[in-house]
Amino acid sequence: MPGRQLDPRLVVRDLVQSVVPYDERESADQQWMLDWIDAGHPLFRTAKPATPDRHLAVYAALLDEAARTVLLVDHAKAKAWLMPGGHVDPDENPQVTVVRELNEELKIAPPFHARLGSDAFFLTVTETRPPHSHTDATLWFVFSASQQMEIVPDPAEFSACRWFALDDAGAWAGDSDPQMHRFMAKLTSALELAPVG
């Protein structure tokens, strides 16, 4: 039916359901997210800094596959090296959110990774740091990128941007998202298994 609007809750549920869990933790987080969605809880942040106290967020993994690196940003508020991303606006499709955030934060519009697709690749349920601790239910998307691409970081958001090697956990494992090591392991495994071309 032309012009028919999709239910935002069903769009989110489909994205969550489409993730193939990498480990027991991701499987448990996926079930938590599905139960949360199905229980009718609010999904979207409606007021800063953290209302409601559980809400959707997205990360954009910018992957230079040839160099085997990902871009992390030194997030000013979180005081940690994270993927670019942000909170999902009310009733917004998270796939739209992640593209919007890349444009707003870095002034780029890269394509979703050709082999990994435009669906969420990874998901996490994480308690954020004080002073405004809350629960982020985060969908992680993978984009094709290059270390040579021009990025214009928003200085209000980021202190720095840097490319990190996928297989150099010592470089990125310090002050970053607590689930970054699991994401990097899943991404490395998927790149080894994903068909080329």
Predicted ranges, named:
Residues 20-59:
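Acidic, metal-coordinating catalytic segment for phosphate/diphosphate chemistry
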Residues 27-31, 141, 196-197:
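Short glycine-rich, low-complexity/disordered patches
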Residues 2-9, 13-17, 80, 134, ...:
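Nudix hydrolase/Nudix homology domain
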Residues 1-27, 95-114:
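Short N-terminal secondary-structure initiator segments
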Residues 14-17, 60, 93-100, 116-120, ...:
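Short low-complexity stretches enriched in small and charged residues
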Residues 89-178:
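Unchanged
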Residues 45-83:
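N-terminal strand-loop-strand
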